[in-house]
Amino acid sequence: KTALIEGALWWNQAIEAAGYINGFQVKVLPEDVDPMDVRYNVIQWVHRSTRGWSYGSSVRDPRTQEILKGHVTLGSLRVRQDYLIAEGLIAPYGEDDSIDEAKDKLSEFALARIRQLSAHEVGHTLGIAHNFAASADGRASVMDYPHPLVTLDDSGEIVLEGADDVGIGDWDKRAVIWGYQDFPDGTSAPEGREAIMRETLASGLRYVADEHARIGNRSSAGPVHPAGCLWDNGSDPVAELNRLMALRKVVLANFSERAIQPGRAMATLEDVLVPAYLMHRYQVEAAATVLGGQTFTYAMRGDGQTTMQRVSAKEQRAALSAMLATLEPEALALSDAVVSLIPPRPPQSGVSRELFPRHTGYVFDPMAAAGTAAKITLAQLLDHKRAARMNSQQLADPGLPSFADMLSIVINDRWPEARDARLVAIARMVPVVLVDELASLLAHKA
């Protein structure tokens, strides 16, 4: 409850930036008040057994769209999921006397995310949309979807502190100032807001909306703006993918039975392994936007913004190299030390969509895990929209790569060579996934 209230109160920073001191308050609702009462803005805490969304809704006057009541629904599932993510990152459960300390570290990681989530959903009730460019602008808004910014210290240890940002962002302040600012008598409100907009543009803050960050489903190559992606970090999506792959290598090397508490079924190690093994998946999507990518703005005539600029050939080649590195057998392989820790699920515990698919019945399947990760990368590289964009960009600038240029590199890089025997099976599996994705591309009707 405390974390939820603290996160919601971050909006007072934006309200005060608009000139209203202590103008945003969050208090516990009296027990005798109906949370559906339209006179009260409400945050409700709900429980859910599986993963799902939280919501920032509002009741509006249909005539004017004035917000009459904000109603936020936050799900407890987020605490459980972030706890699980942290367990996989640091495998914290060592000796019995260290378990309480580990739980404190995991709890703070999860609560930091709840603060951010609370602020995010309250932002929606204030009428503020997502801004998926914020993570590329130094985490400039709580209205992005933040990926935990986990780092390595100088000794190579995983650092969870600072994984989620604290406080309202500069973009959020600008949005509140534009939307809620009152103007002195004699000042034209349209002119005042136009001045606010000019100041915001001059600050360099960027904006990418929902419809240009997640077109279609998760496997489609919707986003084209390298800054406008979900669950990514950093101003350079390719550099961040390389950094995240190095971090992932350390996480998987350290993965052990210490990732679950004593007394839990060893088979549940797979639950913890899945988000750790696939921790790079969203950054792969972000790096893929560089291929055939364009930086663009929602420019208005006369406002001075650059409408569109294609990503350079050098940056596109770097993106392809980084994505192909995620397909290396060394990156896809799980050590036998990890695989041998995971037995079949206990009776009646069952399997779910939260686990890797498998071709081995009830036995853990490391090849299926590798295939899942390979498909994430190859589906992005071989999407029909990305293919069309790359061909289009070369028509405009012959120095930029076409889809055929990229495909030649992908195919020639993927056919297996002689390798360590432990990695041969994976080296052979990746071209199979490649051919499958090529078949899907060929089946697409233009």
Regions found by a protein language model. Give the residues of each.
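Conserved catalytic/binding loops enriched for acidic/polar residues
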Residues: 137-446
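Extracytoplasmic/secreted envelope proteins and their assembly/folding machinery
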Residues: 5-8, 111, 115, 119, ...
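Active-site-adjacent "gating/activation" loops or surface patches in catalytic cores
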Residues: 48-53, 57-104
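The catalytic-center signature of Zn2+-dependent metalloproteases
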Residues: 28-47, 112-167
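Short pre-active-site segment immediately N-terminal to the catalytic Zn-binding motif
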Residues: 2, 98-118
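Fold-level signature of zinc-dependent metallopeptidase catalytic domains
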Residues: 1-34
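Extended catalytic-interface subdomain
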Residues: 60, 66-74, 82, 115-126, ...
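Sec-exported extracytoplasmic/periplasmic mature domains
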Residues: 9-20, 123-124, 128, 148, ...
